[in-house]
Amino acid sequence: MAISDWPEAERPREKLIQKGATVLSDAELLAIFLRTGITGKSAVELARNLLTHFGSLTKLCAANLHEFSKLPGMGPAKFAQLQAVMEMARRALAEELKSGDIMDSPQSVRSYLRLSLGGKPHEVFVGIFLDARHRTIMIEELFRGTLTQASVYPREVVKRALYHNAAAMIFAHNHPSGVAEPSRADEMLTQSLKQALALVDVKVLDHFVIGNNETVSFAERGLI
């Protein structure tokens, strides 16, 4: 049955307008983005198929064009639309992070990092460079690795901190496995970075590990 034949209160777009986006399921939100289904499938059914295929909304949003286009009804146009939506969300969150003390917006930091790093098939290590008032100077990808690890060099991080004239930093990296639990190696690396940056009077405020459905803060766990 086409969505237009559904009771009005059950149609995703009408439900969003009447009750707000937060009440919609992932499939309903995705259906609004897709706008139309394909032969034999409504937009909601197609959205459910996409989520089942990729395993989660995070992994769907992180898929490349080749993976995305394998599914019926998906192609370059829909892929470009999805990437544009994702980039607008990232930029909006980045603007918020640059508007004041980053420590006053912990949820915005988590949201930005999950949107930027969640679901990636390889490990990415990011640095957020801050001034003395903890305002964002720059958000920069520092290292990129493989499915299991990224090689991080404290000396290079110190160079970038000096280049940006940073007074403090926040680090983040993803776990492609989807599990956000920090490893012993993550803890040791964080301490190495903290010690190296202390030599140039740069504080490490936090280190986030990003999984598919969770973000772990070293500071909250007392690991900084």
Curated annotation (Swiss-Prot):
SUPFAM superfamilies reported in the protein's UniProt record: RuvA domain 2-like
CDD domains: MPN_DUF2466
Record-linked Pfam families: RadC, UPF0758_N
Single annotated GO MF: metallopeptidase activity
Ranges for domain MPN: 102-224
Motif (JAMM motif): 173-186
Family according to the record: Belongs to the UPF0758 family.
List of residues binding Zn(2+): 173, 175, 186
Keywords assigned: Hydrolase, Metal-binding, Metalloprotease, Protease, Zinc
Record carries keyword Electron transport: no
One of the GO biological process terms: proteolysis
PROSITE patterns named among the record's database cross-references: MPN, UPF0758
Protein name: UPF0758 protein Neut_0782
PANTHER family: DNA REPAIR PROTEIN RADC, UPF0758 PROTEIN YEES-RELATED
Keyword set includes Zinc: yes
